[in-house]
Amino acid sequence: KIDQWYWAKKNYYSEISWTFDPLVSRNAKLNLIKLGVNISSYHPNFYGDMPDALNAGDESDRLMVSWKVVGENPVQRELVSTPKPNDILIQIPADIVAIRSKDREENLRWRRKVREQFLQAFEKGGQVVGFSTNSEYVVRI
């Protein structure tokens, strides 16, 4: 992704966008902390049914992110260790991939719970401002 950022800068793009699975903790950390992206929206079942071995039986919810291509280098964020009192915390499992491989129903429970929380938070005008040390998205209204 860093190489893509520099390529975009060299080619005069102002922003890069993509999606990622909101339940995958390592992707959340990469996108929010290492890359410092902004989450713009939540899309339930974005790709529809994906019958491959990894995704079969799951719903393809995705967060849409945008990454500003400004300055000399990408800006990283810190993990949030102490959220503010009014922040909404959206917990995700530390390893959804392991859960998905063992218990599809548990995976779907997580998927639907996180979906509901994100949609409610965005409906209230919430913005994702970080990711906590406890595998939680930090949403500020």
Give a label for each model feature.
Residues 11-13, 24, 29-141:
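Intrinsically disordered, low-complexity, positively biased terminal segments
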Residues 16-20:
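Conserved hydrophobic beta-strand within the GNAT/NAT acetyltransferase core sheet
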